[in-house]
Amino acid sequence: MRRLTAPLVAAWLGLSGVALASLAVVTPAEAQQAGGWRKEVADKAKAAQEAGQAGNYKEAIRLLQEAKAKGPLQPAEEQGVNELLIWAASGAKDYRLLAATIEERLATGRVRGNDQIQKLNVLAGTYYTLGDLRKTVSTTEQLIKARGGTGTADDLILLGQAQFQLKNYQAAAATLEQAYPAARRAGKSQAIQVKLLETLNAAYFELKNDQKRLETLHQLMVIQPKTSVFDQLVSQYQRTSANDPVAMINLYRLGARTNVLAKDHFAKYADVALDVSSPGEAARMLERGMASGAIARDDRNQRLLADAKQQLEALKKGLDQQEREARAIPAGEQDARLALTFYTLGNYAKAAEAAKRALEKGRLNRPDDVHMLLGVALMELKRGKEAIPSFEAAEKANPKVAGVAEVWRDVAGG
């Protein structure tokens, strides 16, 4: 299987501009009023502020570094000069200086409360911008601790991404499991939620945790179905169901319904549809595949299409008799076959009715198959909430289809 990768978190958080975040700057005038300033330091700070306000941040930095060279700074001087230096470094996009100056401020022990949180927030993002992932992690952990132990969605996204890039997949998975619901609560965009789940999926791939991967892929199918996601589900369920035809046809039905079938899925769907005696589905997939270029218009496929259409016509001709016989028989198997006939003909309301009768009568070869057919027919009728119990029943009836039933249930409830 191809290696999964995580998207860059900078695209989610706008970290390229993180150093421009507003920070509380103590001006020389304010600091002098509090006392403890030497005139030569205050003069340099004032000149630096004027240079920065004029857009000359490099000159401001030079003047502030000269002020710091005047000997050990008193607490008031340190606060005023370094706050201005943080501001100037931000303006100059000198991220290394910005990080070093924030670290110096924090090391004094005089930065507390919201000011500490704000500085740690900027520092964590700055380290990520600089590519220092270990310091990104440690600083974000400090930030979460400063917030009282509960990180914001942005904190968790940044921490999880940095952990993933450091290949600490266990820690990344644990963090991203918190980040996704936090992002939803915070009203983050669908694109951010998708990227979070994609990174979480990649972490579980590296950890070889198939069960958690499937749970994550199910969530992705709910919020934004993609061919890449669906293709992974097909690979997983081919293996876990041992290519069970009921599991696979219902998975392909989901892919077709959400328009995420990969090129090779059209022919596979058609093949399994013919195997389970659903020629209408086979014909539809062959035609769609040929129209999209996914299936070659060669003699073999043309014969398959013609054969599927011929079978479909035979079903139409015998439909009335099949329905009379199914209703007359006390066991449910004939109604189950009738339900499939109606489904393959595209009559989903009649398919649902026949499937319900089959389940009421019982004595079925594959109850899970009938539960799935009922659920999918109800989905086609836009009755998703009604379909959920059918998928839950299929999930309990047969472990081979449990995963496919679960993803259908999740989509129905989403």
Model-derived regions: residue spans:
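N-terminal leader/linker segments that initiate helical-solenoid repeat arrays
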Residues: R2-L8, L20-E104, T108-Q118, V407
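Structural motif corresponding to the intra-repeat A-B loop/turn of tetratricopeptide repeats
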Residues: A54, A92, L130, L166, ...
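Residue at a conserved register position within TPR or TPR-like alpha-solenoid repeats
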Residues: A51, A89, Y127, Q163, ...
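Generic helix N-cap/helix-start motif at coil->alpha-helix transitions
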Residues: W37-K46, P75-N82, R112-V122, G148-L158, ...
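C-terminal soluble interaction/assembly domains
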Residues: A331-G414
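Solenoid-like repeat scaffolds
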Residues: Q32-W37, K68-Q74, E104-G113, E141-G149, ...
